[in-house]
UniProtKB/Swiss-Prot annotation:
GO molecular function, one term: oxysterol binding
Lineage: superkingdom: Eukaryota
Chain's gene name: VMA12
Name of the protein in question: Vacuolar ATPase assembly protein VMA12
Transmembrane segments: 146-166, 178-198
GO CC annotation: COPI-coated vesicle membrane; endoplasmic reticulum; endoplasmic reticulum membrane; endoplasmic reticulum-Golgi intermediate compartment membrane; lysosome; vacuolar proton-transporting V-type ATPase complex
Keyword flag Transferase: no
Subunit comment: Accessory component of the multisubunit proton-transporting vacuolar (V)-ATPase protein pump.
Pfam families: Vma12
Keyword terms: Acetylation, Cytoplasmic vesicle, Endoplasmic reticulum, Membrane, Transmembrane, Transmembrane helix
């Protein structure tokens, strides 16, 4: 943070013998501090600029206050002509190798955890998709088995009816008796097939 000015030649001349500040009767303490500040030469970061005279902002404020109290015609901005704000070079502290290594280790751990989280989500999605397709395959197979069972039931009942109707002609001469006998046999066969079919469906539902 800036706290000083690089004094310009105008301020140095004004404070010297016969300078513009001589008639202003500066307080002894203020003059001594200003002369001490301007007398010290500091070597700045840029060696081409040579030694630099640094004046603190506090001294500049005290000088400004004194000039205002005396109603001086000498303005501060005129005295500061050629002066610049001094910005000290920021020296970066050396990084702790232990801390750097620890930060790198934490960074790698975080990257690995993020990678595992992403791949875990992908694996879960693949498993869910695989489970859905497997369930769909089971449902299709169950539906196919049900259709075949119903078809076999109908074929068996019809075959029982036809066989009984044709075979009963040697026992019954009337068509009504032959039809009744065929219906009775077909019903018995149908009930037996229905019982077997229901038991088979219960077993399949139990497996699901």
């Amino acid at each position: 943070m800036a706290s000083s000015l690089l004094a310009g030649e105008r301020l140095v001349r004004a404070l010297g013998p016969g300078g513009e500040l001589e008639p202003e009767l500066l307080p002894r303490k203020l003059r001594a501090e200003l002369e001490a500040a301007l007398g010290k030469k500091h070597t700045g970061g840029d060696s081409s600029s040579g030694p630099q005279r640094l004046v603190s902002f506090r001294l500049i404020r005290d000088l400004h206050q004194h000039l205002r109290e005396r109603d001086s015609k000498l303005y501060l901005h005129e005295l500061l002509e050629g002066s610049e704000i001094y910005l000290p070079e920021v020296v970066k502290p050396p990084r702790n190798p232990e801390l750097v290594a620890r930060l790198e280790k934490i960074k790698i751990q975080l990257a690995n955890e993020e990678y595992k989280r992403i791949t875990r989500n992908v694996t879960c999605q693949d498993t869910r998709h695989g489970g859905t397709l497997s369930d769909l395959g089971k449902q299709v197979r169950s539906l196919k088995a049900l259709v075949i069972t119903i078809f076999n039931f109908i074929v068996t009942v019809v075959a029982a009816f036809v066989c009984t109707y044709l075979g009963s002609q040697y026992i019954f001469t009337e068509m009504a008796s032959r039809v009744l006998a065929a219906l009775i046999v077909a019903s018995v066969v149908g009930l037996a097939e229905l019982y077997v079919m229901v038991r088979a469906m219960e077993g399949e539902l139990g497996e699901l």
